[in-house]
C-alpha cells in the first residue's frame, strides 16, 4: 500500500491514534491528526507527537479539516455515525480503521481473536503457546500494543496474535486472518451498536473474508457464536466444554482433547474457572491448527498464570482475600468472576452505563454475594435490579469513590470472605480505562495495611 506523500487524516488521538500517526509519518505520509478533546485532556498524546511533523487539530470538528485529504484512518473510539465519517463519505474519501491498515501493511500471518469476554486472556495464552513452541510472535491489538506497530515490525516468518474488538471490526474491508476465533458473544456495547443482533453481526466480520483453506474457531456451546457458522467460507473448528466433538477441541473424562489427542487434565490448567477452561480450549484450538505441537500447548496451559485485572489475586488481609476483576466491564464477564470464586463474596460493582441490563447478573448472587457495594453511574440501576430480585436492602451500600468502596468492603467483610471488584460496567465515568481502575483498586487495598 503506497502512502508516501499521501495526505492522511487520523481521527482520534488515543493509543491507536498516536501509533497510527507515528507509522504513517514513518511511511512518508503527510499526517493531519484530529481529536475533539482539548490540550489538557490530550497532554500525554501531544507530548508523544511533539517531535513529529504532524498537523494537530483539536476541538469541534470542521469540514475544512478534510480539505485536500486522500485517506481517513479512524481510531477504534470513532463511531461510524460520527460527523467525521459522514463528511468523509460525502466527499468520497477512502475510510480505513487501524486493523484494516495493519493487515494491508503486514507481511506476517495474523491470528485474530474476538469475543465479548476472555479476549485478552485467550490472546495472551495463545501468544505464550507460540513462544513456548519457539516461534517469534507479536501479541498486539486491543490488548495494549498497537496492531499497526506489530504489522510493521513482523517479518514474513513471524506471527501476529491479535485481540480484535467490535469497534475495530466495524471498519474492516479486506482483513483476512490466517485463523480467526470467536470465544463467545453476549450483550455489550449496545450504546454504540444499538442492538444485540447488530453487535453479533459485527463480531462475525472477523472471518467474512477468509477462504476455504483457512480456519475459523467457534464456541459450540454458545448458540449466538455457533449460529454464525453458516456464514463462514473457511473451515469451522468447534470447541466445547460440554460435548465431545471428535473434529474439535473438547473435554472428556476430565481431560482437554484436541481432536483425538489428549492434552492435559483440566484440573492441571493453572488458571481457574469454567470461563478460563473456555479460553484454554479456544487458544489451544488456534495453536493446534497453526501447527504448534501438543507438548508446547500442554506446557503453556500448565504454567500460564493469567493476566492483570482478570480475577487477579491482590492480597489477603485479616483472613479476607481481595480480587481485582476490573476487566469485568459487562454483566456476563462479572457473572463468570462470581462463579469462579468458591468463597462468600463482598462485591464491588458499578460504573459507566453502556445500556446493559443487570437481571442475569443479580440472579447469580444467590446466597454467594453477601454484601453489595455500588459506585458510579449505574449504582442506582443495579440497586433497583437487586431489590427487584429480593436482595436485602440492608446489604447494599452506595459510595462515592472506589477508595471508599474498598474501605466499606473491608469493614463489612468477614474472615473467609473474598472482596471482589468486578464492576459489570465500563470505567469511563470515573477512570480513563479499566487498567487505571484496577490499579486504583489495588492501591486502595494496599492502603488498608497502613
UniProtKB/Swiss-Prot annotation:
One of the GO BP terms on file: cell division
Disulphide bridges: none
Domain of life: Bacteria
Protein family membership: Belongs to the MurCDEF family.
Signal peptide: none
Species for this entry: Caldanaerobacter subterraneus subsp. tengcongensis (strain DSM 15242 / JCM 11007 / NBRC 100824 / MB4) (Thermoanaerobacter tengcongensis)
SUPFAM superfamilies membership: MurCD N-terminal domain, MurD-like peptide ligases, catalytic domain, MurD-like peptide ligases, peptide-binding domain
Protein name per Swiss-Prot or TrEMBL: UDP-N-acetylmuramoylalanine--D-glutamate ligase
This protein's pathway: Cell wall biogenesis; peptidoglycan biosynthesis
Record's keyword terms, sorted: ATP-binding, Cell cycle, Cell division, Cell shape, Cell wall biogenesis/degradation, Cytoplasm, Ligase, Nucleotide-binding, Peptidoglycan synthesis
EC code(s) of this entry: 6.3.2.9
Catalytic activity from the UniProt record: UDP-N-acetyl-alpha-D-muramoyl-L-alanine + D-glutamate + ATP = UDP-N-acetyl-alpha-D-muramoyl-L-alanyl-D-glutamate + ADP + phosphate + H(+)
Pfam families linked: Mur_ligase_C, Mur_ligase_M, MurD-like_N
Gene3D superfamilies linked: Mur ligase, C-terminal domain (3.90.190.20), Mur-like, catalytic domain (3.40.1190.10), NAD(P)-binding Rossmann-like Domain (3.40.50.720)
GO molecular function, one term: ATP binding
Major subcellular location class: cytoplasm
Binding, ATP: 115-121
InterPro entries per the UniProt record, alphabetical: Mur-like_cat_sf (IPR036565), Mur_ligase_C (IPR004101), Mur_ligase_C_dom_sf (IPR036615), Mur_ligase_cen (IPR013221), MurD (IPR005762)
Name of the top EC class for this enzyme: ligase
Amino acid at each position: 500500500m503506497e502512502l508516501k506523500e499521501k495526505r492522511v487524516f487520523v481521527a482520534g488521538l488515543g493509543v491507536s491514534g498516536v501509533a497510527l500517526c507515528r507509522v504513517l509519518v514513518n511511511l512518508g505520509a503527510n499526517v493531519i491528526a484530529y481529536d475533539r478533546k482539548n490540550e489538557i485532556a490530550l497532554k500525554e498524546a501531544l507530548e508523544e507527537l511533539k517531535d513529529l511533523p504532524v498537523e494537530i487539530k483539536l476541538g469541534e470538528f470542521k469540514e475544512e479539516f478534510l480539505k485536500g485529504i486522500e485517506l481517513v484512518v479512524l481510531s477504534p473510539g470513532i463511531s461510524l455515525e460520527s460527523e467525521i465519517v459522514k463528511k468523509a463519505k460525502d466527499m468520497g474519501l477512502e475510510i480505513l480503521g487501524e486493523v484494516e491498515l495493519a493487515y494491508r501493511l503486514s507481511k506476517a500471518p495474523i491470528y485474530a481473536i474476538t469475543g465479548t469476554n476472555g479476549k485478552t486472556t485467550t490472546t495472551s495464552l495463545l501468544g505464550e503457546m507460540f513462544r513456548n513452541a519457539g516461534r517469534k510472535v507479536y501479541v498486539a491489538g486491543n490488548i495494549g500494543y498497537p496492531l499497526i506497530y506489530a504489522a510493521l515490525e513482523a517479518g514474513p516468518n513471524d506471527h501476529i496474535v491479535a485481540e480484535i474488538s467490535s469497534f475495530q471490526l466495524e471498519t474492516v474491508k479486506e482483513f483476512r486472518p490466517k485463523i480467526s476465533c470467536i470465544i463467545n458473544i453476549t450483550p455489550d456495547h449496545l450504546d454504540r451498536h444499538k442492538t444485540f443482533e447488530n453487535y453479533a453481526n459485527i463480531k462475525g466480520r472477523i472471518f467474512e473474508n477468509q477462504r476455504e483453506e483457512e480456519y475459523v474457531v467457534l464456541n459450540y456451546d454458545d448458540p449466538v457464536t455457533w449460529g454464525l457458522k453458516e456464514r463462514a467460507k473457511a473451515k469451522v473448528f468447534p470447541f466445547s466444554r460440554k460435548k465431545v466433538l471428535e473434529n474439535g477441541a473438547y473435554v472428556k473424562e476430565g481431560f482437554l482433547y484436541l481432536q483425538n489427542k489428549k492434552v492435559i487434565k483440566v484440573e492441571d490448567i493453572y488458571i481457574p474457572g469454567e470461563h478460563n477452561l473456555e479460553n484454554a480450549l479456544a487458544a489451544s484450538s488456534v495453536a493446534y491448527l497453526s501447527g504448534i505441537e501438543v507438548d508446547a500447548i500442554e506446557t503453556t496451559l500448565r504454567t500460564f498464570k493469567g493476566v492483570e485485572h482478570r480475577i487477579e489475586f491482590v492480597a489477603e488481609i485479616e483472613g479476607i482475600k481481595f480480587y481485582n476483576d476490573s476487566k469485568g466491564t459487562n454483566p456476563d464477564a462479572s457473572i463468570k468472576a462470581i462463579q469462579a470464586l468458591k468463597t462468600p463474596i463482598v462485591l464491588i460493582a458499578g460504573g459507566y452505563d453502556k445500556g446493559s441490563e443487570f437481571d442475569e447478573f443479580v440472579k447469580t448472587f444467590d446466597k454467594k454475594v453477601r454484601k453489595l457495594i455500588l459506585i458510579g453511574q449505574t449504582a442506582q440501576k443495579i440497586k433497583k435490579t437487586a431489590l427487584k430480585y429480593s436482595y436485602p436492602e440492608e446489604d447494599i451500600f452506595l459510595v462515592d469513590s472506589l477508595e471508599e468502596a474498598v474501605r466499606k468492603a473491608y469493614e463489612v467483610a468477614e474472615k473467609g470472605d473474598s472482596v471482589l471488584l468486578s464492576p459489570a460496567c465500563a470505567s469511563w465515568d470515573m477512570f480513563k480505562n479499566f487498567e487505571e481502575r484496577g490499579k486504583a483498586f489495588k492501591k486502595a487495598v494496599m492502603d488498608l495495611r497502613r
